[in-house]
Each structure stands twice: as structure tokens, then as C-alpha cells.
């Protein structure tokens, strides 16, 4: 229902059955999980449970496994440029109450170094336009490294793929450059990296 769509800490696994998308079962997620800015990855290890990486309400990247928090960034990440207004269905003083949600960019889980374990790439628009964070698991645990891409605008989406003949993945980013302070006019660039051997 529309009242429960953005409720924190809940998720349902959906399945395609008889030509329709239906609820299969409830999924255990972290209590702070929001359905915006989230990705599953194998960054906790190839043979362990998949980790859920998501941007929490305080703009920190959290990594959870089976609903348990295993890491939280100290640096702010995310910073979407869109805000969604939702009617809550509650009326107070004859006024319909609404809630506002910041739409966060979805992190990208992709193996950057060819070791078979995903790294998580997430924009840091909230810190600086064109800045991205790469989270990886090393011998001492999880680590976040910020990289300035040089993009002049807000990174709104990330994607990537790896071909059989390349050791490095191809990364695709959409960057929006707003033309005024009200963000009513903009131009979008789609930028793609090429693997270097």
C-alpha cells in the first residue's frame, strides 16, 4: 500500500508468476533499510551470505548481512537531486499530511580488481559534485576511498558490466548539470569508461 511503501526496515521478495509480479515472501533486512539507494553484493566474501549495502537516512553507507549491521561509513555518501512527496493518508486539522523522501542514487556493486569479490561504488554528491566513494573489503575490514572523477554535475546513476575478454569492468555514469538554482532546467551526460589492459 502507499502508506507502507517507504517504511524503513521492511522488504518483500517478489516473483514473476503467471504473467504477474507477486509477493513471494518477506525478506529480513536491517531496521534502518530504506528502499532507495540499495544494492546486494558479495563483498563479504564469495562463499558467505550476500551483503546489503544501502544509504541510510543520515547519508551514511551501511552494510548489513541477514539484518545485522557489519559496517557503517563515517563519510557522507549519496545526495540525490530529487525529493518525492507522498500523501500519508492521515488528516490533521482538515489538512492531508504528506511525507518527503530524498531519492538517493543506487550504489553499484561490481568487481573492479578482478578478484571475484564486489566493491561498492556510490556517488558522494552530498560532499562534492563529481565525487564517488569506493568501498572494498581488505585484510583489516571495510575501507572507503573517495575519488574525484572530474565530472561537473550531480552523478544520478551508475551502472557497469564486464566482458569475457577484459579484466576490468566498463563503468557507465549519468551526470546532470543544472542550469539554474531552482533545478528546473538541466542537461544530462552519459559517460562510459573503457577498460585499459
Predicted regions and their residues:
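Beta-propeller-forming repeat regions
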Residues: 1-197
Amino acid at each position: 500500500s502507499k502508506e507502507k511503501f517507504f517504511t524503513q526496515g521492511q522488504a518483500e521478495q517478489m516473483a514473476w508468476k503467471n504473467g504477474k509480479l507477486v509477493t513471494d515472501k518477506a525478506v529480513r533486512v536491517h531496521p534502518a533499510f530504506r528502499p532507495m539507494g540499495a544494492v546486494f553484493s558479495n563483498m563479504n566474501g564469495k562463499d558467505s551470505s550476500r551483503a546489503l549495502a544501502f544509504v541510510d537516512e543520515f547519508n551514511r553507507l551501511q552494510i548489513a548481512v541477514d539484518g545485522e549491521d557489519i559496517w557503517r561509513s563515517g563519510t557522507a555518501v549519496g545526495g540525490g537531486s530529487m525529493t518525492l512527496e507522498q500523501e500519508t493518508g492521515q488528516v490533521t486539522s482538515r489538512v492531508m499530511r504528506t511525507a518527503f523522501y530524498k531519492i538517493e542514487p543506487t550504489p553499484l556493486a561490481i568487481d573492479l580488481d578482478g578478484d571475484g569479490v564486489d566493491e561498492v561504488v556510490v556517488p558522494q554528491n552530498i560532499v562534492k559534485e563529481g565525487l564517488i566513494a569506493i568501498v572494498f573489503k581488505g585484510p583489516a575490514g571495510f575501507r572507503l576511498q573517495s575519488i574525484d572523477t572530474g565530472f561537473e554535475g550531480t552523478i544520478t546513476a551508475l551502472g557497469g558490466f564486464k566482458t569475457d575478454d577484459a579484466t576490468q569492468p566498463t563503468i557507465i555514469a549519468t551526470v546532470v548539470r543544472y542550469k539554474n538554482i531552482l533545478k528546473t532546467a538541466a542537461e544530462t551526460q552519459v559517460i562510459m569508461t573503457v577498460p585499459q589492459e
